[in-house]
Amino acid sequence: MNNLCFNRFTLRTDDAKTRRKILRWLALNSRLYEYLPSEAEIRGRFISRKPFPAEALRRQIGKLRGDRTLFLRIVSTDLYSLYVEGNVYLLGAWHRIFL
């Protein structure tokens, strides 16, 4: 598929190493074009191919199971096909929402 998926993310964790690993994965596997860090969380935007590679990200997060403070929310949209998907990682479990 050649359609691009525009994604917004919110990342919260107390572990700086986990934060770096997730941001590095996003930078290497997509086009990270907005990064807004604050004390409590990091928000940003990136572009990926549609559909969003959720399984690859789930495998990466699966390696970080020890971090119970990790919260990651990604909302993916494709304005051409009206595709909307949400992926949320909270308390060690993934939740996926389609609209």
Model-derived features with residue positions:
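Short, extreme N-terminal segment that most often corresponds to the first beta-strand
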Residues: 1-28
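Charged interaction segments
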Residues: 21-99
